[in-house]
Amino acid sequence: MSYQQQQCKQPCQPPPVCPPPQCPEPCPPPKCPEPCPPPKCTEPCPPPKCPEPCPPPKCPEPCPPPKCPEPCPPPKCTEPCPPPSYQQKCPSVQPSPPCQQKCPPKNK
């Protein structure tokens, strides 16, 4: 017999199972001394600052003048204009007698 066999005279036993730790009582919920006050701003928020005012919109180039597809044709009359008709004939002008006396007769 070896030395180890002489020492063990009874069969080996598993180690004892440790019981779970027991708390004396459940933990109480944490107590706040008082409710938290609302956050206080030191000053009102400043208005947002834009880096610079917006530039006016830029067109790529000025609009070209409108182009007609072709020049307009001259207006066409549907019928020729009639010759002007005089309503009455002008009477022949005769110098009055006093006028004839003032003017010398023309030499032809």
Swiss-Prot record:
Cellular localization per UniProt: Cytoplasm
Keyword Hydrolase tagged: no
Top-level taxon: Eukaryota
Regions of compositional bias (Low complexity) in chain numbering: 1-11, 87-108
Listed GO biological process terms: epidermis development; keratinization; keratinocyte differentiation
Compositional bias per record (Pro residues), positions renumbered to this chain: 12-22
Intervals holding Sequence repeats: 21-29, 30-38, 39-47, 48-56, 57-65, 66-74, 75-83
Functional description taken from the UniProt entry: Cross-linked envelope protein of keratinocytes. It is a keratinocyte protein that first appears in the cell cytosol, but ultimately becomes cross-linked to membrane proteins by transglutaminase. All that results in the formation of an insoluble envelope beneath the plasma membrane.
Protein name from the UniProt record: Small proline-rich protein 2H
Record gene name: Sprr2h
